[in-house]
Amino acid sequence: MKNFIQSFLFLAVFVPCKFHAQIEISKEKEIKNTESIADTTPKKQRPERKNVDGSTEVFFSSAWSNSYRKLIPNEDFLPKELGIRADEAPLKIWSYGVGFRSYVHKHIVFEGGLSLLRNGESYSFKGEDSTFTSKSIYTYVSVPIRLQYVIGDQIRFFAGGSFFPEIINRFKETSEWTNSKNETKSIVSKDKQALNSMVFSAGLNAGVQAKLGKYMSVFVMPEYRWQLTSSYTKLNYYKHFARVFSVNFGLIYQL
């Protein structure tokens, strides 16, 4: 009887303890496995806004221009009075360009590109029984170079200077007139022989750039450009220097 009681006490104490210990060990393993899975699960991170410093951007731009010229007699050849050309008026015209902008410093941007620059002038006369109009357009392929100072982040303001080497691509002069019989006639000249093959211009600009997202921006940039060398060759009666005020606007993509 004594042995039976001892055996019963042993089973009553030892077996539940062992069973409880197994449950605790099982729970610990389950917790560790859950923590291990949680550690290996990739966490979603918010995309960081791309830093501008040291970055490069590409852009496409259009420019609406109010174009005119400085026209003076060529004292080095055979100077001639301006005549009716003194009454020429500005011409509204469009230009286009693509390029890149590199942030060489937090506040300094270098810009280079390729542009189709156009300038010109117009003339209009209206008499009692006749009219005459003309329009001259000079088209240049240019590699504009700009250096700008920039401030701001989401909205940036910038200002700087520019230099334009320009190669003549096309010249077009369109003249149209009517006579007393109300007949209309016109003539188009594309002769470039009287023009220098290359000219140089300088400019000043200022503008604003606004970010649309992580990579895209838009910009607006007024610019004044003046031609440093004459459009005409040395054997011309006049010296011709373009004077252009333009408003450039376009899209920028940050690489």
Predicted regions and their residues:
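Predominantly the C-terminal beta-signal and adjacent terminal strand-loop region
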Residues: 192-195, 199-255
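Outer-membrane beta-barrel proteins
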Residues: 42-49, 66, 104-106, 147-153, ...
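Repeated loop/turn-to-beta-strand initiation elements of outer-membrane beta-barrel proteins
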Residues: 107-110, 154-157, 214-218
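Short glycine/proline- and aromatic-enriched beta-strand/turn motifs that initiate or cap beta-hairpins
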Residues: 22-95, 99-101
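Residues on the lipid-exposed face of transmembrane beta-strands in outer-membrane beta-barrel proteins
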Residues: 62, 96-104, 114-116, 143-149, ...
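Bacterial Sec-dependent N-terminal signal peptides
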Residues: 1-27, 155, 248-255
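Extracellular/periplasm-exposed beta-strand and loop segments of Gram-negative cell-envelope proteins
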Residues: 67-91, 118-138, 167-199, 227-242
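Transmembrane beta-barrel architecture of outer-membrane proteins
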Residues: 91-95, 138-143, 156, 199-203, ...
